[in-house]
Amino acid sequence: MAKVDKIRKAVLFGDSDANIAFRDLCSLLISLGFSERIKGGHHIFSHRSVDEIINLQPKGNKAKPYQVKQVRNIITRYRLGVNDE
């Protein structure tokens, strides 16, 4: 769980959006309760309490910076990962 916490902090602080590994971002979403389905190169994440769908595609082995920002906005908007869920 320590690695997921480290990834979560990196995503939330937003200092290194271009340096987040794609697989780490996927792992973070799964640990927050998202379900993943894959269609071609698209990894599509949905969550029962989130109205939005997250659609991610890797850029090499990194996540695309604008998609990291989208994930950050959803985590903060829906207060995901907060102890009082």
Role assignments for model-derived ranges:
Residues 2-39, 48-85:
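Basic nucleic-acid-binding interfaces
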